């Protein structure tokens, strides 16, 4: 993969596989649409459930609204309405009610990036799907969010801020494989096949509410070698308490978000962004049961989420 093409939103074009010598089909077979989520099964879920020790549940989502910083031009707006109640007209004889109208992008705030999010410069997506064929203005015909099964797995919080002895890393600051391995040793944990790995940098805990403009203008992030390492470990998803996972500004100005391509396009690994990791870090939680069931919007590329970590 030469460069990463960062695509946002749905793609405009009219499900086929690409006959491309440079493209390797997934280990899960031609036509697979869920990537490393195939690693989750009844046995792995039962094993992960044994991590519950205290029963404390942590919300990994954050509150979002029309002022939430987002990757341009993403935004959202919400209107609360009273259908049929115009001009003082009674809605029902026995009740009144509110409805809400959401207008916005699913790739805002705490989100999962699906396997249809990132392609290479030739629009080759995960498992050799041709982006020019699967990407319609009305939604993806392959690799849509609705294909993702329940993600119930062993979760790991890797505390990069702690190993660097800071409250938070700075925008544009990378953490490399050496940093990750130092944190794993310090926490006495190891990455295993089927895990959901989430990095704590302190960025959201210390910047999201107090300085949202700074929070959204850049972010600390992983180096490509970290993404490759986690792909070799066969994880299901990789997340962080940043809006990008990759470092912003990027290491190479003309090659943004390299980790996205390595994880999603090349290996079928999901990305979790803007994870609320502060409370887990404060409680020194390293392992937990991770639970996520994304909304099944047919053809969606990304989805706003609120995963749960149970200690």
Where are these regions (language model features)?
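C-terminal segment of classical bacterial N-terminal signal peptides
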Residues: 14-18
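Active-/binding-site microenvironments in catalytic and ligand-binding cores
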Residues: 19-311
């Amino acid at each position: 993969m030469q460069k990463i093409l960062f695509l946002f939103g749905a793609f405009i074009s009219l499900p086929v596989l690409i006959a491309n010598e440079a493209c390797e089909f997934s280990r899960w077979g031609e036509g697979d649409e869920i990537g490393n989520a195939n690693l989750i099964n009844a046995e792995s879920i039962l094993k992960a459930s044994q991590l519950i020790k205290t029963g404390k549940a942590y919300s990994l989502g954050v509150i979002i609204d029309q002022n939430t910083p987002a990757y341009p031009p993403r935004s959202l707006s919400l209107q609360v309405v009273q259908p049929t109640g115009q001009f003082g007209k009674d809605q029902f004889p026995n009740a009144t009610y509110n409805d809400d109208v959401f207008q916005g992008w699913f790739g805002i705030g705490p989100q999962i990036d699906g396997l249809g999010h990132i392609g290479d410069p030739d629009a080759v997506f995960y498992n050799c799907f041709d982006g020019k064929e699967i990407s319609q203005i009305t939604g993806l015909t392959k690799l849509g969010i609705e294909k993702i099964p329940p993600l119930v797995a062993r979760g790991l919080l890797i505390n990069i801020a702690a190993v660097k002895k800071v409250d938070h890393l700075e925008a544009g600051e990378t953490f490399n494989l050496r940093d990750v391995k130092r944190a794993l040793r310090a926490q006495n944990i190891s990455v295993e096949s089927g895990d959901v790995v989430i990095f704590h940098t302190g960025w959201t805990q210390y910047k999201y509410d107090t300085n949202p403009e700074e929070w959204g203008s850049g972010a600390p992030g992983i180096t490509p070698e970290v993404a490759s390492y986690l792909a070799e470990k066969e994880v299901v998803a990789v997340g962080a308490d940043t809006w990008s996972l990759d470092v912003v500004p990027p290491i190479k100005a003309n090659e943004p978000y390299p980790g996205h391509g390595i994880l999603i396009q090349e290996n079928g690994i999901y990305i979790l962004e803007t994870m609320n990791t502060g409370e887990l870090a404060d409680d020194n939680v390293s392992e937990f049961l991770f639970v996520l069931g994304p909304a099944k919007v047919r053809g969606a590329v990304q989805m706003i989420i609120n995963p749960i970590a149970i200690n």
